[in-house]
């Protein structure tokens, strides 16, 4: 877990196809109440369904993008015990998810 070469921000991108909105709502509520994004310096850039699927984006797939000050901060959020053990399990069975951390620039 090292910062990117520029020491700049990193982005957590999660894509999802949701099948159970109630489970996702419980996950979203718990994540929001936990304050984990803020505790790790994360800020939501965008979330939801695309405004315009211009090429190759599948129907029914949404995304959330969260900006962190560094890759280390993003990884600290993602791998935190609170997220992995208390929050993330709440979305189990809600849909299919993909997640990746990207360095800016």
Feature-to-residue mapping (PLM):
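Short hydrophobic/aromatic beta-strand or adjacent loop that forms the aromatic wall/cage
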Residues: 61-63, 96-97
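Short S/T/G/P-rich N-terminal loop/turn motif that feeds into the first structured element of a domain
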Residues: 1-62, 69-73, 102-105
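C-terminal end-helix/capping segment
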Residues: 88-105
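A common structural junction motif
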Residues: 34-35, 82-88
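A generic structural signal for short hydrophobic patches within well-formed alpha-helices
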Residues: 73-74, 83
